[in-house]
């Protein structure tokens, strides 16, 4: 029965409906084939099941005489939020009065082929390359930073009253020059009141978002004891807006606490490091660039770091780390799968902090358990289209932890984002194509499940997920109609 | 500390089993309600509750099985945290006892099955199968050896479980087949292309393995599996029914709706048990069918016979004698008599009703003179109702006599210690009935006459019956009849001791001693009513809106007092206070008021007049003689009882609403104390002395979603689902229906547009207008992007009229009144509107995280609850909505209410509740902007609506102050209260001691049950569970002693058992 929204509900918010639709795009079978579907009434039969037969179990043998009837399959409409809420309020639908996890099914969407991006959700940066981006934790606010040090703020869900379609578009809100050098990472504090940027000028800055004023600088150029090379990443701690960690090409990781005293020189405030770990990832005696240092969520003391020289991830715990000779709390073992060492371009964690994902230069994403780093990776995500060719390629885990997005997708001269489903054992992936023409580098998720990506062609795109309508229809349209649109493809 | 107790316990039934639980010779029905198991016995065509067991977990499924050596069936209970345990009946103790204690089969790494947990028992009682996770079956072998069972008392009924892998991930349904050689399963599943297949497995218990069987079927329909005794399995698809076995595979178009429940029918012979050639099947539309399958050598013929309509069933249990128990989540559960061909009745007959008010979508509290009542929006789909829950006096019918046209009746005790004469007064006839001590009724022709009777009593020291009819005054001494025939028709009459007083047409009042006239008094107008009280005082109500008091003595009749009223008196009753000179005169007027005058020594006490409106039609007042109460019945639109309880007037509704007239009637041998009549019958009934919760049902077309009320009407937002089978489409229709409060009948409605879903309603400050918020739910859109705000008002000719309409960009999920403004939650925003001069203006709006579910306001704060992201605190200052604080935790909120200053109570979709605290004095800004989790606990049910109100006013000495009332999906109403600083330690310790002393079912821990359950964490609960504490009141003294003394390593309490009892009695006063 189609009216049964609850059935869809019990299927992870209508997942089944979409898969059935998506699977219509299976390779067509010739009409002469035994498995050819009849247009109106399908005729079905069973394979002979008496005695032991060698035939494969699930093959359908065609026979003229119909024994079983089946009504015409009518496509089921997707579950809608309002109806799902109604069903939840009534305690389930009639056929499935029992679903223990009613709540999680409402609005739970797990289909990778639902992403699309409209032309109105694409913004071009003129004459400068976007280098990094970051979503606010509670708003649909997107910060994009460029190679020249400009910081631009966008609203990814801007509702325009004049817009007839009444759909949100992306709109620039504000922008300022944050650094006089390239910005490599941008990060919002958990409550979105502060914004931190890390730059090629060997410093990081913390901005008050309401006034857009730099309230403090992390690092001093040319002064000993601070970063002596480009700062690759700066991150706020999840639980405290005062704790930050930054990492640099000089191989050091520095912990900052904004509650400590700093120094003020010429009216500019500089923070002092709380702890500096030099040579955090030493590779056969040589320093190597630290590509990523990120806090574990739900922790104020643990940081995961990666480097450009090998695949090792290190977990630093502030509670145990020695100030003179710091040693990591845990290190991942060497990979035995590949012949040579590949660096890790970026590391991200799942929202619950249980999983760590590392994008490696060998174009594989490795999944580690944050509690058992020593035992090596537990899962890999691969896709032939994924090419992690530069250290600018970043990855991000969705706020529900179910989807992993990574830049660097390449397919037939088009570039895009590759998304993976992290909930299943067999990895399924899709690529968001059509949105960018050059290499896609960084990606990030908003709290509402929107995805943003930047590309070397100067474009910033916002991707939305919808169960039906846009994304599904786009694939069937011809090229001219979907010009400047982006959509996901299996 | 938060104290939570039930006002109304959950009533939704999702599971039930039929087994021989208590003894091997009779059947029991065991019903599972959220966390409560109820054991019923099936006797005399009724289900009688034997016992109920509170389980400290949410029951997911219950099944019965029979270990070989046990004479009775055991039951296995699967709980929501992927655990199971068994229970059996201990014949020595006559209680439910634990069998296998809790077994955990949870696997955190696996994904839960999408069709929900399934619990299955092999028809040959070899294994039990549990399917919780995708691709994994947990097999629990049933104990076979008789020997070990007999030797140890703590006998195991089940072996340890083991898990086996199956290939099918997306399982729709599983059935255990009738296969005598090995336990086998049929699995209906969907593949990755959403095509449905059936495969079969055989379980090898010894090797702990599962083998694929050769019966398979491809590309069938999603549905339910019913195993057949012939070894195959029926698949009830969405439209077709398939039979699949090794040899036969057939299908037939039979169904119009998917089925929800089925039960094999029961043969009348208890030895043979189930008769699985015939099944009773219920579908989504609430229709019941009899399903028959006829097997021949090569084929099966299937037949579906319609039986009738009932509640939408979540479980069915066929009982002997063609009875059927229908357990329902959406409406009352019922025991039905199925039509049978032999008895030649074709209708479903309801034998027993089990009230269920689930799912409660919304509720309001309505206060009037008679106390509070809760009106809930209950039911869903076709079974929508409004339920009016009152704390009222329950009337239990003992015997019914079908009889029409009765106007009034009188009972009198004539030379007996019980009321042996009943006079039934019809329009132009009186029938007298003599009741023998054994309760046999026989007519008395001497006293029956052609006129209707006005008054009956006994005079001359109970030696004669006095009967006043419209024509004469008659005296009957048991043999002979004496009478005085009136020249004019008698309008009213009354007597006291040996004196009789009647009023005849023309306003003449005559006084008699026996039937000898002793005096008369001429009034100005006709007499409407009269009441003879002691000391020869007569109160007379006149049509000139006066009440006069006549005193009769030897000298004559004198007017001693007169009262001028504004309305015409219709019925007068004088009620004396025991042991006092004073009394109260109750006067009902022609417009539904009841006036009360207090008299002292024959004088009206000044300023003692009280007016109570009990209806709009004239009210009949009648005296009710009871041992404890001097009570007055008031019969208008609603029957009510008025009495004084510690000098406070209490007006309580009666549970039966169709009463026309009422009279007290004492007959101890029948166990009745009253007599009442309706349009169609007279009932001898027993009225209880104490009030209890009674539920009145008002059926609604469609199902109600939201409700609000003003002083005259209930405004109910309803939805209707119209389904068409052919196109498989579903239409949602929405209505605003207006119900009159007194008559509870629908007087007006407004139909909304197609695709428009009604979401919210509030009453505006002026008590007249209502604002309705809707959302358009077009089929091709994921989330609503448009909606309307509408203002309605009732016109003078009882029509509902739309006054204003305002289009908004989203669905108006919630509306509240903030001062004179309207706060609306529209999709992911909160907007403030002002209604002025017939139009709506937007004053301001603000974005909220994802989707606003509920809003609560107090003086200066607006709290918005979000679909996924907990709550946000907003303030409206200088025409600007600003965000003051927010909770950054993920929380799937369902309702929010302000608990006290800066404390917010939020309920969550998984049954948790959190109290959040706003710290507005913290020195750090980030702390001020962040809400803190103050307390968190588990309530166990999804709460749809929380309101700040109390149903029963707390008394001064109450240990707990009630604060909130929560309505849940499972039909319970919870009281959330505060135990106060001084009482908390004692109650907490008491709770702790009870946990330690009272053994729990299945060895479950009450502490764990009330723990907050987050996605990844559980944490101890800050909660005092009232239902746990109250549950010990009925326990025996030694156990109470142990609780007080802190047995089992508890803490010794500083109170006596008597104190404990009074504490619990105090706590019990929170709810009826």
Curated annotation (Swiss-Prot), chain A:
Organism from which the protein derives: Schizosaccharomyces pombe (strain 972 / ATCC 24843)
Gene3D superfamilies: YVTN repeat-like/Quinoprotein amine dehydrogenase
PANTHER family listed in its UniProt record: DENTICLELESS PROTEIN HOMOLOG, LETHAL 2 DENTICLELESS PROTEIN RETINOIC ACID-REGULATED NUCLEAR MATRIX-ASSOCIATED PROTEIN
Record region (Disordered): 18-40
Main location, first listed in the record: nucleus
Molecular function, one GO term: protein-macromolecule adaptor activity
Assembly description: Component of the DCX(DTL) E3 ubiquitin ligase complex, at least composed of cul4, ddb1, cdt2 and pip1.
Taxonomic superkingdom: Eukaryota
Family: Belongs to the WD repeat cdt2 family.
Pathway membership: Protein modification; protein ubiquitination
SUPFAM superfamilies: WD40 repeat-like (SSF50978)
Protein's job: Substrate-specific adapter of a DCX (DDB1-CUL4-X-box) E3 ubiquitin-protein ligase complex required for DNA replication during mitosis and meiosis. The DCX(DTL) complex, also named CRL4(CDT2) complex, mediates the polyubiquitination and subsequent degradation of cdt1 and spd1. Involved in the regulation of mitotic and pre-meiotic S-phase progression.
Pfam family, one: WD40
Key words, A-Z: Cell cycle, Cell division, Meiosis, Mitosis, Nucleus, Repeat, Ubl conjugation pathway, WD repeat
Gene Ontology CC terms: Cul4-RING E3 ubiquitin ligase complex; nucleus
Protein name: Cell division cycle protein cdt2
Gene that this sequence comes from: cdt2
From Swiss-Prot, chain B:
UniProt-listed Gene3D superfamilies: 1.10.150.910, YVTN repeat-like/Quinoprotein amine dehydrogenase
Pathway membership: Protein modification; protein ubiquitination
A GO BP entry: double-strand break repair via homologous recombination
InterPro entries for this protein: Beta-prop_RSE1/DDB1/CPSF1_1st, Cleavage/polyA-sp_fac_asu_C, Quinoprotein_ADH-like_sf, RSE1/DDB1/CFT1/CPSF1, WD40/YVTN_repeat-like_dom_sf
One term under GO cellular component: site of double-strand break
Compartment(s): Nucleus
This protein's record includes keyword DNA damage: yes
Molecular function terms from GO: DNA binding
SUPFAM superfamilies per the UniProt record, alphabetical: Quinoprotein alcohol dehydrogenase-like
The organism's place on the tree of life at top rank: Eukaryota
Record keywords, A-Z: Cell cycle, DNA damage, DNA repair, DNA-binding, Nucleus, Ubl conjugation pathway
S-S bridge residues: none
PANTHER family in the cross-refs: DNA REPAIR/RNA PROCESSING CPSF FAMILY (PTHR10644)
Subunit structure: Interacts with csn1, csn2, cdt2, ckn1, iqw1 and wdr21.
Similarity field: Belongs to the DDB1 family.
Biological function: Component of an E3 ubiquitin-protein ligase that includes cul4. Required for ubiquitination and the subsequent degradation of the DNA replication licensing factor cdt1 and of the ribonucleotide reductase inhibitor spd1. Also required for transcription-coupled nucleotide excision repair.
Protein name (database record): DNA damage-binding protein 1
């Amino acid at each position: 029965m189609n009216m049964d929204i609850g059935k869809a509900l019990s299927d992870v918010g209508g997942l089944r409906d979409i898969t059935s639709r998506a699977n219509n795009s299976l390779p067509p079978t010739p009409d002469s084939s035994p498995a050819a579907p009849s247009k109106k009434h399908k005729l079905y039969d069973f394979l002979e099941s008496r005695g032991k037969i060698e035939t494969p179990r699930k093959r359908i043998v065609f026979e003229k005489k119909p024994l079983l009837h089946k009504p015409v399959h009518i496509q089921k409409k997707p579950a809608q939020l309002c109806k799902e809420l109604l069903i939840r309020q009534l305690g389930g639908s009639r056929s499935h009065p029992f679903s223990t996890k009613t709540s999680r099914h409402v609005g739970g969407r797990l289909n990778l082929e639902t992403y699309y991006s409209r032309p109105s959700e694409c913004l071009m940066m003129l004459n400068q390359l976007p280098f990094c981006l970051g979503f606010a934790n509670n708003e649909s606010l997107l910060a994009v930073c460029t190679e020249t040090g400009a910081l631009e703020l966008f609203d990814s869900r801007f509702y325009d009253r004049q817009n007839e379609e009444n759909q949100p578009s992306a709109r620039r809100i504000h922008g300022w020059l944050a650094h006089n050098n390239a910005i490599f990472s941008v990060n919002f504090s958990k409550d979105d009141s502060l914004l931190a940027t890390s730059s090629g000028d060997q410093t990081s800055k913390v901005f008050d978002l309401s006034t857009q004023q730099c309230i403090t600088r992390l690092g001093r150029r040319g002064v000993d004891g601070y970063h002596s090379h480009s700062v690759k990443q700066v991150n706020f701690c999840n639980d405290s807006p005062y704790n930050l960690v930054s990492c640099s090409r000089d191989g050091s990781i520095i912990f900052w606490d904004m509650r400590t005293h700093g120094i003020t020189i010429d009216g500019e405030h500089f923070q002092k490091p709380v702890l500096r770990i030099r040579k955090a990832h030493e590779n056969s005696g040589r320093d190597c660039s630290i590509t990523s240092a990120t806090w574990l969520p739900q922790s104020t003391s643990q940081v995961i770091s990666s480097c450009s020289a090998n695949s090792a991830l290190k977990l630093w715990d502030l509670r145990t780390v020695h100030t003179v000779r710091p040693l990591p709390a845990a290190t991942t073992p060497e990979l035995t799968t590949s012949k040579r060492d590949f660096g890790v371009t970026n590391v991200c964690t799942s929202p619950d902090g249980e999983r760590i994902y590392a994008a490696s230069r060998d174009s594989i994403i490795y999944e580690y358990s944050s509690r058992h780093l020593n035992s090596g990776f537990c899962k890999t995500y691969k896709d032939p289209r994924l090419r992690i060719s530069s250290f600018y390629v970043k990855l991000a885990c969705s706020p529900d932890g179910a989807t992993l997005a990574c830049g660097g997708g390449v397919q037939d001269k088009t570039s895009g984002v590759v998304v993976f489903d992290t909930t299943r054992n067999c990895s399924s992936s899709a690529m968001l194509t059509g949105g960018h023409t050059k290499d896609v580098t960084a990606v990030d998720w908003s709290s509402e499940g929107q995805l943003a990506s930047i590309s070397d062609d100067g474009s910033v795109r916002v991707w939305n997920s919808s169960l039906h309508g846009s994304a599904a229809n786009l694939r069937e349209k011809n090229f001219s109609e979907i010009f400047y649109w982006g959509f996901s493809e299996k | 500390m938060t104290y939570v107790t039930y006002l109304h316990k959950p009533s939704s039934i999702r599971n039930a089993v039929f087994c021989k639980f208590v003894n091997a010779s009779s059947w029991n029905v065991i019903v599972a309600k959220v966390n409560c198991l109820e054991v019923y016995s099936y006797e005399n065509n009724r289900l009688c509750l034997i016992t109920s067991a509170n389980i400290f977990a949410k029951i997911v499924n219950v099944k019965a099985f029979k270990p070989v050596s046990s004479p009775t069936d055991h039951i296995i209970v699967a709980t929501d945290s992927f655990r199971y345990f068994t229970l059996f009946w201990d014949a020595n103790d006559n209680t439910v006892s634990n069998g296998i204690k809790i077994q955990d089969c949870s696997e955190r790494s696996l994904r839960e099955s999408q069709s929900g947990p399934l619990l299955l028992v092999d028809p040959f009682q070899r294994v039990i199968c549990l399917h919780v996770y995708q691709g994994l079956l947990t097999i629990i072998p049933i104990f076979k050896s008789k020997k070990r069972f007999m030797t140890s008392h703590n006998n195991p009924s089940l072996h340890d479980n083991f898990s086996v892998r199956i290939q099918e991930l997306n399982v729709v349904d599983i059935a255990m087949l009738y296969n005598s050689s090995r336990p086998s399963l049929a699995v209906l599943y969907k593949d990755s292309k959403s095509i449905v297949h059936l495969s079969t497995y055989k379980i090898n218990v010894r090797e702990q393995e599962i083998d694929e069987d050769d019966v398979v079927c491809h590309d069938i329909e999603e549905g339910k599996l019913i195993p057949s005794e012939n070894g195959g399995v029926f698949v009830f698809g969405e439209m077709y029914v398939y039979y699949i076995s090794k040899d036969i595979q057939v299908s037939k178009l039979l169904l119009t709706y998917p089925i929800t429940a089925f039960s094999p029918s029961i043969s009348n012979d208890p030895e043979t048990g189930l008769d699985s050639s015939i099944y009773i099947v219920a579908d989504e539309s609430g229709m019941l069918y009899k399903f028959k399958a006829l097997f021949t050598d090569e084929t099966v013929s299937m037949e579906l016979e319609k039986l009738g309509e009932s509640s939408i069933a979540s479980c069915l249990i066929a009982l002997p004698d063609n009875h059927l128990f229908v357990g329902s989540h959406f409406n009352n559960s019922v025991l039905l008599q199925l039509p049978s061909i032999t008895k030649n009745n074709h209708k479903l007959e309801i034998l027993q009703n089990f009230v269920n008010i689930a799912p409660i979508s919304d509720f309001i509290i309505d206060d009037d003179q008679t106390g509070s009542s809760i009106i809930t929006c209950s039911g869903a789909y076709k079974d929508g109702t409004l339920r009016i829950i009152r704390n009222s006096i329950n009337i239990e019918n003992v015997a019914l006599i079908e009889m029409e046209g009765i106007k009034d009746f009188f009972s009198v005790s004539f030379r007996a210690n019980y009321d042996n004469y009943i006079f039934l007064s019809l329009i132009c006839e009186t029938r007298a009935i003599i009741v023998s001590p054994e309760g046999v009724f026989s007519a008395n022709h001497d006293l029956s006459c052609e006129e209707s009777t006005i008054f009956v009593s006994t005079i001359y020291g109970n030696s004669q019956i006095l009967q006043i009819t419209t024509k004469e005054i008659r005296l009957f001494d048991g043999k002979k009849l004496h009478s005085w025939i009136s020249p004019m028709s008698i309008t009213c009459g009354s007597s006291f001791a040996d004196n009789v007083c009647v009023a005849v047409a023309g306003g003449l009042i005559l006084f008699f001693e026996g039937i000898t006239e002793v005096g008369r008094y001429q009034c100005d107008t006709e007499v409407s009513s009269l009441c003879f009280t002691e000391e020869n005082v007569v109160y007379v109500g006149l049509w000139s809106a006066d009440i006069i008091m006549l005193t009769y003595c030897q000298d004559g009749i004198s007017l001693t007092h007169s009262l001028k009223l504004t309305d015409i008196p219709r019925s007068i009753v004088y009620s004396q206070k025991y042991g006092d000179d004073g009394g109260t005169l109750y006067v009902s007027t022609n417009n539904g008021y009841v006036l009360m005058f207090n008299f002292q020594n024959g004088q009206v006490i000044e300023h003692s007049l009280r007016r109570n409106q009990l209806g709009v039609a004239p009210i009949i007042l009648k005296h009710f003689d009871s041992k404890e109460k001097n009570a007055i019945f008031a019969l208008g639109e609603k029957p009510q009882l008025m009495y004084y309880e510690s000098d406070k007037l209490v007006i309580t509704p009666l549970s039966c609403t169709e009463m026309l007239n009422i009279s007290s009637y004492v007959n101890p041998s029948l166990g009745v104390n009253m007599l009442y009549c309706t349009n169609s019958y007279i009932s001898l009934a027993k009225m209880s002395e104490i009030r209890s919760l009674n539920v009145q049902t008002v059926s609604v077309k469609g199902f109600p979603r939201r409700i609000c009320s003003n002083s005259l009407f209930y405004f109910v937002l309803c939805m209707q689902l119209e389904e068409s089978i052919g196109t498989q489409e579903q239409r949602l229709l929405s209505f605003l229906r207006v119900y009159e409060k007194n008559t509870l009948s629908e007087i007006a409605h407004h139909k909304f547009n197609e695709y428009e879903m009604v979401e919210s309603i509030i009453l505006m400050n002026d008590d007249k207008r209502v604002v309705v918020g809707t959302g358009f739910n077009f089929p091709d859109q994921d989330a609503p992007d448009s909606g309307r705000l509408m203002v309605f008002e009732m016109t003078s000719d009882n029509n509902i009229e739309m006054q204003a309409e305002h289009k908004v960009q989203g669905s108006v999920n919630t509306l509240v009144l903030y001062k004179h403004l309207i706060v609306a939650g529209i999709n992911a925003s909160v907007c403030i509107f002002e209604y002025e001069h017939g139009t709506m203006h937007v004053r301001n709006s603000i974005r909220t995280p994802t989707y606003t579910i509920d809003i609560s306001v107090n003086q200066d704060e607006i709290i918005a609850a979000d679909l996924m992201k907990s709550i946000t605190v907003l303030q409206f200052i200088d025409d600007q909505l600003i965000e003051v604080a927010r909770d950054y935790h993920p929380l799937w909120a369902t309702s929010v209410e302000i608990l006290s200053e800066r404390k917010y109570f939020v309920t969550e979709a998984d049954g948790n509740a959190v109290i959040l605290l706003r710290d507005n004095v913290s020195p750090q800004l980030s702390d001020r902007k962040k809400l803190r989790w103050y307390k968190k606990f588990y309530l166990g049910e999804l709460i749809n609506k929380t309101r700040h109100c109390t149903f029963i006013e707390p008394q001064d000495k109450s240990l707990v102050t009630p604060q909130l009332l929560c309505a849940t999906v499972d039909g319970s109403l919870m009281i959330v209260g505060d135990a106060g600083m001084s009482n908390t330690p004692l109650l907490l310790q008491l709770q702790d001691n009870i946990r330690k002393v009272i053994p729990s079912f299945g060895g479950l821990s009450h502490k764990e049950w009330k723990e907050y359950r987050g996605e990844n964490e559980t944490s101890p609960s800050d909660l005092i569970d009232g239902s746990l504490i109250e549950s010990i009141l009925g326990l025996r003294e030694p156990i109470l002693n142990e609780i007080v003394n802190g047995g089992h390593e508890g803490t010794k309490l500083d109170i006596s058992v008597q104190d404990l009892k009074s504490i619990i009695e105090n706590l019990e006063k929170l709810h009826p």
